[in-house]
Amino acid sequence: RSVSRGLGDVYKRQIPLIVDEAHGAHFGFHPYFPENANAKGADVVIHSLHKTLPAPTQTALIHLNGSLVDRTRVKNYLHMLQTSSPSYLLMAGIDGCVELLREKGAGLFDSYAERLKILRRELEQCRYIQLAKTRQFDPSKLVLSVCGTGMSGRELYFKLLKQYHLQLEMAAGTYALAMTSIFDLEEGYSRLVRAVKEIDEELFEMRTQDKYTPIESGQKVEVPKPEVVLRSWELTDIPIERRKRQSWKDSVG
């Protein structure tokens, strides 16, 4: 609700709302997933097709909605920042992805949602590795939490990679993130479930033998707040005669 109220203030002031929905290109294709920002009143929405849809790396879309956004201005900035020699392979990949979703998207997402439901039920059987989720979340992202087990997210990440040859998206703190897509196969899901359950069983055995020291959930970590001496955008205003080349070895920061 607070987000909705905030959006209302934005609309009243006639401020264009830009949503970076890079990891949400699959939103809105099935009720199992969150709604697409284009359907929620956003003026500009950015989607990285390659992150969650079948498209080559570096393919993305920018959607312009409503009348608040100056399309000519957006095009001018794109001409300034984008290459003058675009890859036709990448553009063909975008067209292929859009055409696939237009023709077969409904069936693909129906199957995808059902496979994900089964996968999540299987993973929820673990005793120590937990599927983290909130009231509103994207079920296609598998956040594997090892909080309280004594294992770190990076340990889980590299164990899955080196021992089970499963490449996850990232790891940080006490969790690791696994990405899924409409073209994942049951064989891949089975490998993931088997690997996570085996690691979960190892955690159980280590816990009973006191080989791991549990990390308490909600433990606070103080983040240092360094003094801001100079902001990056201010560097452009420094005259050339005041600049000098400095080796990183002699740098303070």
How would you name each of these model-derived features?
Residues 92-107, 183-187:
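Amphipathic alpha-helix from the class-I
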Residues 1-11:
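Single conserved hydrophobic/aromatic residue that forms the stacking wall/gate
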Residues 5, 15-36:
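Conserved PLP phosphate-binding loop immediately N-terminal to the Schiff-base lysine helix
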Residues 120-122, 126, 141-253:
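Non-catalytic terminal extensions of PLP-dependent enzymes
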Residues 12-15, 42:
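A short helix->loop->beta-strand "cap" motif at the edges of active sites that frequently abuts
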Residues 17-21, 45-48, 54-55, 131-133, ...:
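General beta-strand structural signal in soluble alpha/beta enzymes
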Residues 98, 102-134, 154:
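Conserved PLP-dependent catalytic core of the aminotransferase class-I/II
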